[in-house]
Amino acid sequence: MAVYAVTGGAGFLGRYIVKLLISADDVQEIRVIDIVEDPQPITSKVKVINYIQCDINDFDKVREALDGVNLIIHTAALVDVFGKYTDNEIMKVNYYGTQTILAACVDLGIKYLIYTSSMEAIGPNKHGDPFIGHEHTLYDISPGHVYAKSKRMAEQLVMKANNSVIMNGAKLYTCCLRPTGIYGEGDKLTKVFYEQCKQHGNIMYRTVDDDAVHSRVYVGNVAWMHVLAAKYIQYPGSEIKGNAYFCYDYSPSCSYDMFNLLLMKPLGIEQGSRIPRWMLKMYACKNDMKRILFRKPSLLNNYTLKISNTTFEVRTNNAELDFNYSPIFNVDVAFERTRKWLEESE
């Protein structure tokens, strides 16, 4: 029976991973490692769940928290393209924090690491080039924001660490998973968009081109892919060692606006008029200045305007081929759960 650790386990994705691990037959103990205290800690009658408050940049505390762990699912990150955090803060957590986790793996002889990367480790790039493809599609990877850069660098770090020698001469095996736009209950961004629509009289004003298609994925299926990858990476001859996979399910691929309308229309949200691009650009520039001068974050800035209007569509089944992944939540269930959460959080 194994001991798993989930960094960022009190977060949006991490909590769902912990919930699914409770049903994993080969897991005896789950260590939930997060810098914040979980206000609603998950409990179980069949698994030992230990919550450890810890900064992943503090090597000594990380080492202590991970001592005796067999496998790490590393989800801890600062996900920010809105200006809430400084560039240094994002790099410290996303890149250097991952360095700390890898160092602990080497020092403690932890053989398996599943890393939560991001689609932004690939794109959309700073040129606004569309991406339609899979894990092996050629694309100009040129990050346009420090968040994307930090996830790209951390993914490369984790991939390079695969097959490296750790304590007692054993080998470390790693795998990276790249979620596209995650949605589901607990998604703060979806909640913000919903609240904005309510404030505007149940109207969603459109800001994104209809042909800017983005792949989306439900949080429960992303969590399931992590749990499944954690199982398969331990098999001798596993195909996933040293590989990266996009996270996907059967959620609609469409523009951000159209996706939100599909999700929220049963909640009474109606389509509004399209805001002209010149006006969006003007507000984006204004918000960028506020961020620079006053550290004021904003959902609309030049970076978010560009990436939301740049197609990033994943077409792959590599996770199915290599570790037998298939979504465990269909779209109807995913939408129903998300809508219920939005209604209850009003």
UniProtKB/Swiss-Prot annotation:
GO terms for biological process: steroid biosynthetic process. SUPFAM superfamilies: NAD(P)-binding Rossmann-fold domains. Induction: Expressed in the early phase of the viral replicative cycle. It holds the Pfam family 3Beta_HSD. InterPro entries: 3Beta_OHSteriod_DH/Estase, Lipid_A_modif_metabolic_enz, NAD(P)-bd_dom_sf. The keyword Cytoplasm does not apply. NAD(+) binds at K151. It catalyses: a 3beta-hydroxy-Delta(5)-steroid + NAD(+) = a 3-oxo-Delta(5)-steroid + NADH + H(+); a 3-oxo-Delta(5)-steroid = a 3-oxo-Delta(4)-steroid. Pathway: Lipid metabolism; steroid biosynthesis. GO terms for molecular function: 3-beta-hydroxy-Delta5-steroid dehydrogenase (NAD+) activity; steroid Delta-isomerase activity. The active site is at Y147 (proton acceptor). The keyword Heme does not apply. Catalyzes the oxidative conversion of Delta(5)-ene-3-beta-hydroxy steroid, and the oxidative conversion of ketosteroids. The 3-beta-HSD enzymatic system plays a crucial role in the biosynthesis of all classes of hormonal steroids. During viral infection, steroid production contributes to virulence by inhibiting the host inflammatory response. This is 3 beta-hydroxysteroid dehydrogenase/Delta 5-->4-isomerase. It comes from Vaccinia virus (strain Western Reserve). The gene is OPG174.
